[in-house]
Amino acid sequence: MERIKELRNLMSQSRTREILTKTTVDHMAIIKKYTSGRQEKNPSLRMKWMMAMKYPITADKRITEMIPERNEQGQTLWSKMNDAGSDRVMVSPLAVTWWNRNGPMTSTVHYPKIYKTYFEKVERLKHGTFGPVHFRNQVKIRRRVDINPGHADLSAKEAQDVIMEVVFPNEVGARILTSESQLTITKEKKEELQDCKISPLMVAYMLERELVRKTRFLPVAGGTSSVYIEVLHLTQGTCWEQMYTPGGEVRNDDVDQSLIIAARNIVRRAAVSADPLASLLEMCHSTQIGGTRMVDILRQNPTEEQAVDICKAAMGLRISSSFSFGGFTFKRTSGSSVKREEEVLTGNLQTLKIRVHEGYEEFTMVGKRATAILRKATRRLIQLIVSGRDEQSIAEAIIVAMVFSQEDCMIKAVRGDLNFVNRANQRLNPMHQLLRHFQKDAKVLFQNWGIEHIDNVMGMIGILPDMTPSTEMSMRGVRVSKMGVDEYSSAERVVVSIDRFLRVRDQRGNVLLSPEEVSETQGTEKLTITYSSSMMWEINGPESVLVNTYQWIIRNWETVKIQWSQNPTMLYNKMEFEPFQSLVPKAIRGQYSGFVRTLFQQMRDVLGTFDTTQIIKLLPFAAAPPKQSRMQFSSLTVNVRGSGMRILVRGNSPVFNYNKTTKRLTVLGKDAGTLTEDPDEGTAGVESAVLRGFLILGKEDRRYGPALSINELSNLAKGEKANVLIGQGDVVLVMKRKRDSSILTDSQTATKRIRMAIN
C-alpha cells in the first residue's frame, strides 16, 4: 500500500509524467551500455573516428630514425608530441604507406611457407567458381563444422609440443614427440624454416592453424566440408544462396571423406564374419588411408558418423552420447524413460517383442537432409515438428519418428510378414524390421495415422498423408516448419562398450549404434584406401578375390608348403581362403574340396607327383568343408565375370596361367607374382622341410625294406635307416640323425643330396 501511495504521489507531479512518457525507454540503457566496462562496444565506429584524427597510431621512438619527418608530398609523418601516458611517438597513417613503399626489404622466401594456409586459400578462391545467386528461404541448422582447411589432425597438446620444438628448440621443458605425424611434421618444418626472420610468435600462430582442427558451431544450409565453410559468408545469407565450387581440395576434407568410406566398408564386412568384433579390429589395424594407419586417424579425427563411431568404440575410444536410428541422430533433450519388454501384434497377427520406452521424452532428430523435434510419451507420439529439403526427406523423417514412437496404429499398419535380414542373413531386431517395412512403403502407415484440424501458427504448416502441405489439416501431431533444428552442440564424449556383434551401448546399457545403422551409400574415396586384410579382398569384386588369393599363396609360399606337408588342416582353415569360397558354386564346393584333399594326400604319400603349380592352383578349393565322394574332376569352376570360368586341374587356363620360362603366374590376365623356385624341382622345398633331422645317404637300398612315405618317417628311431619315397616317385636311403643340433643345415643339403642320389 505504501509503495502505491508513493507512486501516485510521484505521478501527480507533471515533470515525472513528462519524463516517463517522452523519454525513450532505452535512453539510459544506451548511455550505460557505452560508458561502462573496458570492452570496446562499437569497434568499427571507434576505428573510423580514430582514423579521422591526424596521428591515430603510436610507434616505438626508434621509428623517428627510420622514417623521415615528411614524405615526398611534404605531409608530416609523425608528431614531435609524445603519446600521453607512454613513451611512444604519435604517427600518421601516411607513415605506414611510406614504410610499405620505401621501408627495408627482407627475404620473402619464408612467407609462403609460414603463411601457407593463407596462400593456399587465395589459390582455392582464384580457381573456385561462383555461380548465380538464388533468393529463397534458407533452412539453416547449426552444425559443428571444421573452419580451418588444410590442417593436420593433431591434438592441441601434440601440436603444442611440435610448435615448441620447431620455434623454440632450445627452450627447457619436457616435450615428447611420439606419434609418427608429430615427428614427420617437426622434421619438415625445421628444414623449411632455417634462417627464418619472421617473428617466432607469428610462426607459432601460423603453425597452430596448420596443425590443429578448429571447429565452430555454425548455421549451415549447404556443404559442411571446410572448403565450403571458409566461404560461408559468400554463399548463404538469410534469404539467398550463391552457388560455389571450390577451386581445390584439402587433405583434411579428403581424410574425413575417405575415413567414412573405409569405416562403412569395414563394418559391413565385419558384420557378416564369424566374429564381427575381432574381424573389425583386425581390419582397422591393417588398413591405411592415404598412407596413414587408419587407427591413428581414428584416434585423432573427430568425425561423427555411425560406422566411424563403431570403429572408435571397438578401439575403446570415447564417442558422442547421442544414438542413431534410421539414419537420424537422436539426442534426448528432456524427460526420461524406463525400458520394458512387451509383446505386440502386427496387422498380420505376427507377434513382435519390442523394448518399450515408458515415460515422457523429447528428442532432436538430425539427418542429412531433414531435422525434427519429437515429443513422445509411452507408445504415443505427442508432437513432431519436421523441416527438410524436400518432400522425400520430410517423409523419411516422419517414418522414422512414427516407428520410434512405437504407437499401436503404426504396428497395426504392417501388412504381410516381417522377415528382413541383415547382410549375415540374421533376422533384424523388431524395431529395424518395422523401420525397413515402412521405408519400403509407408502408404498404409500414413493413411491409418489419423488427421486433425490445425490452428494457424506462424512458420508452421500441416502435412497430409499423401505428403502435400495444408493450412487446414494435418496428420495427427505432425507439423512442418520452415526452421531447421540445430544439431546437438555439445562435443562431449562418453565411455561406451561394444559387444561381439558390434552393438555399441552407453554405460546405462542403451544401444547407441549397431551395424543396421550403417549407411549403404557407396562412394569413391578421395585418398587411396589400402586394405591389407584378406576380408576386404571382395570389396573390388570376384576378380580381385581370385588374384589376391593366389598372390597371397605365392607371397607366403615358403610357410605354406611346410604347412601343406605337415599340418594341412591348419592350412585349409586359414582365413585367407574364406573370400575364395564365395566364388565356388555352392552345390559342388564340398565335392571339389574332398577331391583336392584326396589328390594332395596322394601327392604326400604315394604317387610322388608333387607339383608346386598344381598345389598353388588347387589349394583354395581345399578350404571348404570336404564331402567324401568318388568323383574325379579335370576342371574346377569359379564364378567370375558374371559366369562360370574353368580352372584346369592339369595345365593352364585363362583363369590360372603359369609361365614356366618366366616363372610368372597370371590370374585372369593380371600378374599374381613370381615363384621363387622352379615347380619341377618344387619337391625340394617340401622335401627339405620334411627331411629336416634326416641325413640322405644315397640311392635306394633294398636291405632296408620297402619305401616309406614321407609321413611314415616320423616313426624311425635315432640312427635308424630307411628307404623313403620322395616327390617325383624316386626312392632314396635316409638315416634319422643322432643329434638335433645340425637339423638346420639339412634343408639346405637335402636338396643337393636328393639330386645326387637320384642321378
From Swiss-Prot:
Record GO terms (molecular function): RNA binding; RNA-directed RNA polymerase activity
Keyword Transferase belongs to the record: no
UniProt short sequence motif Nuclear localization signal, positions renumbered to this chain: 736-739
Keywords carried by this UniProt record: Cap snatching, Eukaryotic host gene expression shutoff by virus, Eukaryotic host transcription shutoff by virus, Host gene expression shutoff by virus, Host mitochondrion, Host nucleus, Host-virus interaction, Inhibition of host innate immune response by virus, Inhibition of host MAVS by virus, Inhibition of host RLR pathway by virus, Inhibition of host RNA polymerase II by virus, mRNA capping, mRNA processing, Viral immunoevasion, Viral transcription, Virion
Any one Gene Ontology cellular component term annotated for this protein: virion component
Site residues, Mammalian adaptation: 627
A biological process term (GO) from this entry: 7-methylguanosine mRNA capping
Main localization, broad class: virion
UniProt-annotated location(s): Virion; Host nucleus; Host mitochondrion
Subunit architecture: Influenza RNA polymerase is composed of three subunits: PB1, PB2 and PA. Interacts (via N-terminus) with PB1 (via C-terminus). Interacts with nucleoprotein NP (via N-terminus). Interacts (via N-terminus) with host MAVS (via N-terminus); this interaction inhibits host innate immune response.
Assigned protein family: Belongs to the influenza viruses PB2 family.
Function summary: Plays an essential role in transcription initiation and cap-stealing mechanism, in which cellular capped pre-mRNAs are used to generate primers for viral transcription. Recognizes and binds the 7-methylguanosine-containing cap of the target pre-RNA which is subsequently cleaved after 10-13 nucleotides by the viral protein PA. Plays a role in the initiation of the viral genome replication and modulates the activity of the ribonucleoprotein (RNP) complex.
Protein name as it appears in the record: Polymerase basic protein 2
Organism field: Influenza A virus (strain A/USA:Albany/12/1951 H1N1)
